[in-house]
A protein has these predicted regions:
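Active-site-adjacent substrate-binding region
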Residues: 299-407
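A non-catalytic alpha/beta surface segment that caps or lines the substrate-entry region
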Residues: 136-196
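Second-shell loop/turn segments in exported
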Residues: 120-129, 142-155, 179-181, 220-231, ...
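N-terminal hydrophobic or amphipathic helices/low-complexity stretches enriched
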Residues: 94-151, 406-407
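Acidic/histidine-rich catalytic neighborhood of metal-dependent amide-processing enzymes
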Residues: 187-189, 221-313, 317, 338, ...
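Solvent-exposed loop/turn segments at secondary-structure junctions
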Residues: 146-149, 183-187, 197-200, 211-215, ...
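Structural recognition of the beta-strand scaffold that forms the well-ordered cores
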Residues: 134-142, 190-194, 204-208, 227, ...
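N-terminal accessory interaction module
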Residues: 22-103
Length: 407
């Protein structure tokens, strides 16, 4: 990895750093990120934990941009969480709490393997998902010039999605509510669709993906960030899953679908939502995160299963869902801290899981640029498996008593 990091900075020194207004502001940030990468970009380390390879670091916007690009050069995602003002006074305590939380969640890995019974109706509903319709939805989402959370008008696509969801869900067998969540850390809003549980409404299953995009390319039009793979794909998987679930009965548990704001700037929307959930002692049983599902870099129907900062219990359940219904090939992989919104939930002690389009070393390298568009390198048949994961995650966990073991 050190060789890759040195090569990355040699490349920067030879090409120069072209930075757009989207990427730099006057305000530095204090973030939670991987220790080795914070050091590599020259960040000021406020606290560190070598055993976790994590650091609370003070970074300029230029350094944050370099951090994101460094992660991509290593086959990783952006890899940081922007911390709130009330979290930065005691960075050492923050890291210690995360270490305890991580150990507690991973202790569940000592439990036995989950084996699901096949359900004909669940398979029928999962089979309603359509790769062609998925492509149409990704095309619509990626048609916006950008979905950047710091753009002058960061919410047009958000408001449009709220309108579309209300239209698409007409005829569902269950009641639903679509609302917009306002944030402190960004002007962009998060979209939430809630399906109340029939018998256990206080037990919540969360399914989410980020709805923003960003362009960090060296050249070209910096205002153009179509984000077809990152993350119109995961956003569209959730939409298409809901369309299939319209034919299902009302779930026993409450389902909450999120299209998060500001992930590309440090998990902004999901961090606030997960913190509020913990503060209110919300009984979130499980969290599924879908982020980048279109590029079959490791082969068709080869899916990366992120093992760091995720729940062994939920990975076990997702593996059983896959083996029972989807039949893709799952490959364990790591993506580092903060590679997507599941990290926000994990840090608050909730069980989260995230399948990925490939192993990170063979992920789509066109993301965060104007080249992240629909082209022949993408596979909607491949991505449709992730729509099925969302459908089955909602059905299996939304209609059962499954919950993390307690030790």
């Amino acid at each position: 990895m050190l060789i890759n990091i040195l090569f990355y900075f040699l490349t920067l020194s030879l090409t120069g750093t072209v930075v757009s207004a989207h990427e730099v502001s006057e305000k530095p940030e204090i973030v939670l990120t991987n220790l080795d990468q914070a050091v590599a970009v020259g960040g000021v380390i406020l606290s560190k934990d070598k055993s976790l390879n994590l650091a609370v670091s003070y970074l300029t916007q230029l350094q944050l941009n370099q951090l994101s690009k460094l992660n991509h050069s290593l086959g990783k995602c952006a890899g940081f969480e922007t911390l709130a003002a009330n979290e930065i006074n005691q960075p050492g305590i923050l890291l210690e709490k995360l270490k305890v939380t991580d150990l507690k969640i991973n202790k569940v890995g000592l439990s036995r393997t989950s084996i699901l019974e096949f359900n004909d109706d669940y398979q029928r509903i999962a089979n309603l998902t359509d790769p062609v319709q998925l492509q149409n939805t990704v095309k619509w989402i990626s048609s916006y010039p950008n979905r950047y959370n710091k753009a002058p008008s960061p919410n047009q696509h958000v408001v449009d999605l709220q309108t579309k969801l209300n239209e698409w869900m007409v005829g569902a067998k269950w009641k639903f509510d679509v609302n917009l969540i306002t944030h402190q850390s960004t002007n962009q809003k998060t979209v939430r669709l809630t399906i109340p549980g029939k018998t256990k409404p206080n037990e919540v299953i969360v399914l989410g993906g980020h709805y923003d995009s960003v362009n960090q390319g060296f050249f070209g039009n910096k205002d153009k960030a179509p984000g077809a793979d990152d993350n119109a794909s995961g956003s569209a998987n959730l939409i298409e899953a809901l369309k299939a679930l319209k034919s299902a009965e009302q779930p026993q548990r409450t389902l909450e679908f999120y299209w998060y704001a500001g992930e590309e700037s440090g998990l902004l929307g999901s961090a606030e939502i997960a913190k509020e959930a913990k503060a209110k002692n919300k009984n979130v049983i499980a969290v599924l995160q879908l982020d980048m599902t279109l590029f079959p870099g490791s082969g068709e129907q080869v899916v990366g299963l992120v093992t760091d900062y995720t729940s062994p219990w939920l990975r076990d359940i997702l593996t059983s869902i896959n083996n029972t219904y989807v039949k893709a090939r799952l490959v364990d992989d790591e993506c580092g801290y903060g590679c997507s919104d599941h990290a926000s939930w994990h840090r608050q002690g909730y069980h989260a899981v995230t399948p990925f389009e490939a192993v990170t070393s063979t992920m789509n390298r066109n993301i965060h640029s104007e080249k992240d568009v629909i082209d022949t390198s993408l596979s909607f048949q491949h991505s449709n498996s992730f729509t099925k994961y969302a459908v089955l995650f909602a059905l299996v966990l939304g209609n059962s008593d499954l919950r993390p073991p307690v030790f």
